[in-house]
Amino acid sequence: MQYSDYPQMALGHQRYIDYAVRHAHKVAIIDTDFITTQAFCIQYEGKAHPFLDSMIKEYPFDVTILLKNNTKWVDDGLRSLGSKKQRQQFQQLLKKLLDKYKVPYIEIESPSYLDRYNQVKSVVEKVLNDEELEGLQHTKRTLTNEK
């Protein structure tokens, strides 16, 4: 993959996001957002992509659930972030980008898959019931054109 491939990947994500939102019943769960794609771009290409920046601003998410990188690494052949140090650095990059774009997020820190499932389920139930989310790192965001 090359730097020039990231916009095409983002456009593919955009189509899936649009479809999911159109067919969702109140909640659409998106596995990979544009911030994650931007983080991989920075990690692998050494710089952010302006197209991804515009997609992050154009597609604000109500809340992001950030899972801490503290489970066993599974090498899927697509990513090369297997060391503990690399995973921690990538987690910090994700948080930095979430903060930069003022994306509301909740970080789930448990390494237990069952605990993660139950915590995510609780977040989704609160969203469905219009309840306040505890532990939200940002409130709703308002982006202005940054120059």
Predicted feature residues:
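Short, amphipathic alpha-helical "lid/cap" segments that border enzyme active or binding sites
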Residues: 10, 117-121
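A glycine- and Lys/Arg-enriched "phosphate-lid" helix/loop adjacent to the NTP-binding pocket
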Residues: 44-115, 128, 135-139
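C-terminal alpha-helix
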Residues: 122-130
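Catalytic phosphate/metal-binding cores of nucleic-acid and nucleotide-processing enzymes, i.e., regions
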Residues: 1-4, 25-27, 129, 135-143
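Hydrophobic helix-cap positions at the C-terminus of alpha-helices
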Residues: 16-20, 97, 127
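Conserved nucleotide-sensing/catalytic segment adjacent to the nucleotide-binding pocket
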Residues: 1-46
